[in-house]
């Protein structure tokens, strides 16, 4: 009899644990700046209905990707929503927007992510509606985007991250549609200089923004990430900097995103987040 009871208790416990699963939805958002609907994946913890206001991590995709990349190519990462009691939002950032606002009215992704999307999420979900409850990160183009948007909108985001980010665009003038967005570097050097992350460190003061940067040693963006790390050190800007063996690929990002979300959770868990 005791053996049967033990087996029953084990089964109940197992079912209770395995029944917890983050809720993954695809929603339509609207950008007034670009006059179009844009899809986003919204991940909520299993107990969202009974929970209070919770923090949000905005997780950006890379060049040629879309809103579904993280869910499809990093299976299991969404469990962090349950583990850390947070929401994760994966917006569509266009094929090659680099998350800039440009002269092209169809590429206003800085406005979309930092203003329109944040407003949409705050209006539809139980979120902490200030920078203490918002973080942003991403991979490659999205790593650039995470830092670019957070550096420029420190009133919106309290923490920022980058995985394999293109944090200095200038060495790559002919790659990844950047010239389509900014014009040719040879003819528009000033625009390029003003829109590369490494030239925006002057916007930071120590302890105003929590920052984590991660890049594999075999990544073609490793050199520019090293340079950004040195610039942050020179300016005494606290940040976490992770270098591991690895290249510019999904096996690396599947691992890296776990560290990013842990870092963001630690930021959210502070009694008082840094304020500008």
Protein language model annotation of sequence segments:
Residues 1-7:
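Positively charged n-region of N-terminal signal peptides that target proteins for export
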Residues 7-16:
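Bacterial N-terminal signal peptides
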């Amino acid at each position: 009899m005791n053996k049967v009871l033990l087996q029953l208790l084990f089964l109940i416990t197992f079912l209770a644990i395995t029944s917890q699963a983050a809720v993954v939805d695809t929603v339509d958002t609207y950008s007034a700046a670009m006059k179009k609907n844009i899809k986003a994946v919204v991940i909520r913890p299993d107990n969202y209905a009974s929970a209070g206001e919770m923090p949000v991590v905005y997780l950006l995709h890379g060049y040629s990707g879309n809103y579904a990349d993280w869910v499809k190519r990093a299976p299991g990462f969404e469990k962090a929503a349950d583990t850390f009691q947070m929401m994760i939002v994966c917006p569509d950032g266009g094929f090659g927007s680099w998350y800039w606002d440009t002269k092209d009215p169809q590429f206003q992704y800085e406005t979309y992510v930092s203003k329109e999307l944040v407003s949409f999420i705050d209006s539809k979900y139980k979120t902490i509606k200030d920078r203490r409850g918002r973080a942003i990160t991403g991979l490659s183009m999205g790593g650039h985007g995470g830092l670019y948007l957070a550096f420029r909108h420190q009133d919106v985001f309290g923490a920022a991250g980058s995985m394999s980010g293109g944090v200095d665009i200038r060495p790559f003038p002919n790659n990844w549609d950047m010239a389509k967005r900014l014009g040719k570097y040879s003819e528009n050097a000033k625009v390029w200089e003003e829109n590369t992350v490494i030239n925006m460190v002057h916007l930071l003061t120590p302890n105003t923004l929590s920052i984590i940067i991660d890049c594999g040693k075999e990544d073609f963006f490793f050199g520019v990430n090293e340079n950004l790390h040195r610039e942050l050190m020179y300016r005494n800007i606290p940040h976490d900097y992770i270098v591991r063996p690895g290249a510019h690929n999904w096996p690396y990002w599947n691992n890296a995103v776990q560290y990013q979300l842990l870092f963001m959770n630690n930021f959210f868990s502070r009694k008082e987040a840094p304020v500008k």
